[in-house]
């Protein structure tokens, strides 16, 4: 019986790891201390990077409204109490940016009754499969060769460059258009709430007039909210015998200026400016931008 429980535990850890390396995962921890009002955390038991993006100031002194946009990590591990918290947020829809493989491993979102779920998967450029093979190998040298000496950082820069593909742009653009026209709150998330969700939030905040440095700081705060959960995951990987050096995962677990810069440089190279990226890259016309700002800024 003990052997069966051990096997199940290892399988559970492996599922978490594989989903994690498809752009991070959430380890269930006690709610973190609430963050400052701008981009404040919504403390939950089953997700650690859930935030209302309201409170940020725009160039002209206005403020992004609270209760309109929530960014999050995966909602598959929410407790009943967590679901009740979200029920109090009057959600009009939830947008899931995860790939089907991630959903299969981590499970579907747990949502309040009646809240529509919209699947808009952002392709992970094969990262999920690649990491599955590397971690399952239990081969320290193979893991070092793939992730060490800048290998993990190279992988992440490739992920961020992929945010400019046609499929990714279509998903990001559709979500922003939904935010422009929804009367109520919208929650969007990926797995760890840091890369796809982080880039989308960065673009959204800049689109409504929040200064670039402020939008960047919001992006980087995922490191603070995720630190304890990510450390726990690395310890689980080591204890389960999958990696001798789980610190190789750190560049995959973190958000970094360099990763965001990869996407920003690419959009500037391809579109010339952030404004042109919004209109030509994401299909957000001037009328929609006006609606977006009116809906999200007060």
Model-derived regions: residue spans:
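Cys-dependent protein tyrosine phosphatase-like superfamily
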Residues: 2-186, 200-298
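Catalytic nucleophile loop of clan PA
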Residues: 189
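Ser/Thr-glycine-rich phosphate-binding loops at phosphate-binding pockets of nucleotides
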Residues: 192, 196-197
